[in-house]
């Protein structure tokens, strides 16, 4: 029959280790004291036999005896403290490893902590953290699934209502254009809710890869973005630089990020204006979208990236575009900035990403 080895607590390890160290050095000190005392007694006896019992000689022998005890005692205490420090450092090493593991994690890394220790407290803390992370992951997954299911269930009836309105307009010559426009806004809002729910699923499965911003993100999105801008006679200008910029991330999410930036510029820019995409790699990767709109109130830039916050309610939307951009940027461990252009009126929205 095999018995499972019982894990020792951190307190027990410290007490046992320090106790053994003190016991060993106490035995050494006792032996040293006995050895020196025996030697001094023999010297005194020899001095008495030789009639060298004058005060000067006695004080000299006393000083030698005290020195022979103090100097080794100081050395032994110092050595004891040093060894105790090394022992405590070795025993608490799992705590330091746990600290490094937690500090190195990003906010989106919800994988279980893989630290194995024979110390009871460390095992309990790691187990509790892993259980908390598991519950948090389950809650977030359920929230994403609920949002995606609700948005998906809304798209089907909205599409049916739009189809019926188009048939009503053709058969009964009824002006339903305002209703169709409102339905289109609702369907766009539902699509954004779906995007917000799905953002991060690729990263949660570790789907990291090298992505070229021009070749894998901007050019594949050009036709879709250009079609969107043509509805308001706007022009999309691509980067002039021939050099591509490579980052590490998810191409699908970065295309979603770019689409939301361009869509936001398209919504708030006048008709017939230009929307420009820039990329650079000095020193980190930058992807920027500039428009020729009225600009923004820079004191409110922090709130504009929050969910359901809009720049201007006159332009429609539900305020999820920049929130999606901010979320995708965080997943790529980057930074999102929003500011007014300096050379002319307009807004510059750009993300700072780490190069591969």
Swiss-Prot record:
The keyword DNA-binding does not apply. This is Sensor protein BasS. The lineage of its organism: Bacteria, Pseudomonadati, Pseudomonadota, Gammaproteobacteria, Enterobacterales. The modification Phosphohistidine is found at residue 152. Pfam families: HAMP, HATPase_c, HisKA. InterPro entries: HAMP_dom, HATPase_C_sf, His_kinase_dom, HisK_dim/P_dom, HisK_dim/P_sf, Sig_transdc_His_kin-like_C, TCS_sensor_his_kinase. GO terms for molecular function: ATP binding; phosphorelay sensor kinase activity. Member of the two-component regulatory system BasS/BasR. Autophosphorylates and activates BasR by phosphorylation. Plays a role in the adaptation of the organism to the host environment, in particular to neutrophils, and therefore it plays a role in virulence as well. The chain crosses the membrane at residues 14-34, 65-88. The gene is basS. Residues 1-13, 89-356 are cytoplasmic. One of its GO terms (biological process) is phosphorelay signal transduction system. It is a multi-pass membrane protein.
